[in-house]
Design a protein with these regions (language model features):
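Short, surface-exposed ligand-recognition loops at beta-strand->loop->(often short) alpha-helix junctions
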Residues: 1-6, 45-48, 142
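N-proximal, solvent-exposed amphipathic alpha-helical segments enriched in charged/polar residues
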Residues: 1-29
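A short interface-forming secondary-structure element
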Residues: 33-56
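A short amphipathic beta-strand at an alpha->beta junction
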Residues: 62-87
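Walker A (P-loop) phosphate-binding loop of P-loop NTPases
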Residues: 145
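Nucleotide-activated chemistry modules centered on ATP-dependent adenylation/adenylyltransferase
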Residues: 78-141, 149-337
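Charge-rich, low-aromatic oligomerization/scaffolding segments with amphipathic character
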Residues: 48-63, 90-94
Length: 337
């Protein structure tokens, strides 16, 4: 129905119409399904040319072709994603375990490799229903944010029979709107949930002294508490929403014989994939980056924004964040007054 030549002709006509410079654009492949079009460009500059400034070109192309959506990706990004997925599969397969959830995760990685251009979690889970483990195989660290919520949804869908736990140091780190998300999600998924009360006064005090960035200390403390919960309850896997530890680092054996599984990273997931799945669960989304404590630290000690920006850039380099998403997050720091 659609050819490379047709798409290139339409894109060039739109670029000329809106006054964009004429450029040579190279398309590697196109894929069409369910009134959605995937355009795979040879490289990122070709991708940028098709999207246009502010998404203007691809928006007009979608209107002109009467499509529900158009996805523009570079072939190099897919090569990188395919490589990471193969490493994830190899790492998970090397684990000497008969855990139901890990077996189902490997099947999902295989499916994503087979449908690398068009894999969609909604469609995948509507077409594939997995048996759930009789035993609780995973503890999911649930903060109420998008990444941890996505991780809990996946853990449930993949049959880990998870329990969700939330470390609660108070509203300066875990505000009430996040608790509302937690309640909504665990009820929707029918997942058992527990709060772990914690004293983070030292982390908060050090943060307000300007001596440390709070995220590292907070993450470390939370990890220890979730680890201890899993150990006390003899649950073999702890799941986090980390997007950076991809490939061979997606799952690691801890000193206490627990496995730490970074579920989004294991599937080389980007933010748009996460948002697409969690929008089915009526969760609130929040603009900006981080918790109220981080907001106050940025406000009181502007130099601390540098370390938050470094985190955003790491996620961008890994492909977890698109440059436009990263720019929005960084720009939000300028609204802190």
């Amino acid at each position: 129905m659609y050819t490379k030549e047709l798409i290139l002709d339409e894109v060039n006509a739109i670029r000329e119409e809106i006054g964009h410079d004429e450029v040579n654009i190279f398309i590697e492949d196109i894929y069409f399904e369910n009134n959605e079009l995937w355009i795979i460009t040879e490289d990122r500059p070709d991708k940028s040319a098709i999207i246009g400034k502010g998404g203007w070109v691809v928006g007009k192309l979608k209107e002109k072709l009467g499509l529900d959506s158009i996805h523009v990706e570079s072939y190099g990004d897919f090569l990188n994603k395919r490589y990471k997925l193969k490493l994830s599969k190899k790492t998970i397969r090397n684990i000497d375990s008969n855990l139901v959830g890990l077996n189902n995760l490997e099947k999902t990685i295989d499916n994503k490799l087979e449908n690398i251009y068009s894999f969609n979690f909604d469609r995948y889970f509507s077409e594939n229903e997995f048996d759930e483990s009789e035993n609780i195989e995973a503890v999911v660290a649930l903060s109420g944010g998008v990444d941890s919520s996505f991780s809990l949804i996946l853990a449930k869908k993949l049959g880990f029979n998870p329990i969700a736990v939330t470390v609660d140091p108070g509203t300066i780190i875990l505000p009430n709107q996040f608790k509302k998300n937690i309640s909504t999600l665990v009820e929707s998924l029918n997942v058992r949930h527990e709060y772990i009360k914690a004293d983070y006064s030292q982390v908060i005090g050090e943060s307000f002294s300007g001596s440390v960035h709070p995220c590292g200390r907070c993450s470390k403390n939370t990890g220890k508490l979730v680890n201890q919960y899993a150990k006390d309850n003899e649950i073999p896997i702890i799941v986090f929403g980390d997007m950076l530890a991809t490939g061979s680092q997606c799952i690691n054996l801890q000193e206490d014989s627990l496995y730490r599984l970074n579920l989004p990273a294991s599937l080389s997931v980007g933010k748009q994939e996460i948002k697409s799945l969690i929008r089915n669960y009526d969760l609130q989304t929040f603009k900006g980056f981080g918790c109220p404590l981080l907001y106050e630290v940025h406000k009181k000690f502007p130099h601390m924004r540098k370390f938050s920006i470094q985190r955003i850039l790491r996620e961008t380099r890994s492909g977890a964040l698109e440059p436009g998403e990263a720019l929005d997050l960084i720009w939000s720091f300028n609204k802190v007054k």
